[in-house]
């Protein structure tokens, strides 16, 4: 490979890296929402996998059935994190297509 081609390739990689870093920063500002149990529990998460809110309907708060509430919170949280993964793939997938880097995103 010629030095000129190698230099161009390095410039392209640096440009792509900057674009990817910008996209990662933008992900922090995006949110996803997951609702389970017919609206009983809603979890809102950021694009960098931080749980921002957990909203629980008063109807589901039953001191005699705490386990159901726990299950709904877990289900909503897992669904929100799944949606974040989909958002990350949508926003950053264009940078990793064709690269074989398992577990990177």
Curated annotation (Swiss-Prot):
Positions of region (Disordered): 1-26
Main location: cytoplasm
InterPro entries found in the cross-reference section: YbaB-like_sf, YbaB/EbfC
Annotated TM spans: none
Low complexity bias spans: 1-22
One Gene Ontology CC term in the entry: cytosol
Any GO molecular function: DNA binding
Subcellular location: Cytoplasm, Nucleoid
Pfam families to which the protein is assigned, alphabetical: YbaB_DNA_bd
Keywords: Cytoplasm, DNA-binding
Known partners and oligomeric status: Homodimer.
Summary of the function given for this chain in its UniProt record: Binds to DNA and alters its conformation. May be involved in regulation of gene expression, nucleoid organization and DNA protection.
Family, similarity comment: Belongs to the YbaB/EbfC family.
Protein name: Nucleoid-associated protein ABC0038
Species, as recorded: Shouchella clausii (strain KSM-K16) (Alkalihalobacillus clausii)
């Amino acid at each position: 490979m010629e030095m000129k081609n190698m230099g161009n390739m390095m410039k392209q990689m640096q440009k792509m890296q900057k674009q990817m870093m910008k996209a990662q920063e933008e992900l922090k500002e995006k949110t996803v929402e997951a609702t389970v149990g017919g609206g009983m529990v809603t979890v809102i998460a950021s694009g960098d996998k931080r749980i921002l809110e957990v909203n629980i309907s008063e109807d589901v708060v039953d001191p005699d059935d705490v386990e159901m509430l726990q299950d709904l919170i877990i289900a909503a949280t897992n669904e929100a994190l799944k949606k974040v993964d989909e958002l990350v793939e949508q926003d950053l997938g264009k940078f990793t297509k064709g690269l074989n880097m398992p577990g990177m995103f």
